[in-house]
């Protein structure tokens, strides 16, 4: 089973979008690590789709129909809301800091404890946590 790619990767200037597409593809091939199944279309995936003005099920259908990430981005831009550079800055600022001094902090701390990472005071956001929990070097 495989982990998704890093949340720090960008597509169309947006963090997490490549990860969402990667999870959709890996899940369809039966390659996505089971711990990610319950969050498909929820959490960051769901928030990103809401922000983009698209339905997660429609994004899944389009992604599995094939094409490059850039082609799927073009579909998102045609079917979702028009995003400005400021919109991307707002999303990226929200996403990259989620878990740091906000309503998600208790959940992040629980996830760290459950993963044996409670001692890692350098993991202050979900993105930080994902990197280490999924075997990548922290940024």
Features from the language model and the residues they span:
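Polar/charged low-complexity regulatory segments
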Residues: 1-35, 94-139
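Alpha-helix boundary/N-cap detector
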Residues: 8-15, 19, 39, 43, ...
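Amphipathic alpha-helical packing elements
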Residues: 33-76
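Aromatic-residue detector
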Residues: 47, 89-91, 124
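Amphipathic protein-protein interaction modules
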Residues: 59-115
């Amino acid at each position: 089973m495989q982990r998704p790619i890093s949340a720090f990767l960008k597509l169309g200037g947006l963090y997490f979008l490549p990860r969402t597409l990667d999870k959709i593809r890996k899940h369809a091939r039966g390659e996505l690590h089971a711990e990610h199944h319950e969050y498909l279309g929820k959490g960051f995936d769901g928030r990103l789709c809401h922000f983009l003005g698209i339905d997660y099920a429609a994004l899944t259908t389009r992604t599995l129909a094939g094409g490059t990430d850039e082609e799927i981005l073009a579909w998102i831009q045609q079917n979702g809301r028009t995003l400005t550079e400021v919109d991307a800055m707002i999303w990226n600022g929200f996403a990259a800091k989620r878990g740091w001094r906000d309503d998600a902090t208790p959940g992040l701390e629980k996830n760290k404890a459950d993963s044996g990472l409670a001692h890692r005071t350098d993991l202050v956001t979900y993105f930080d946590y994902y990197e280490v929990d999924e075997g990548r070097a922290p940024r």
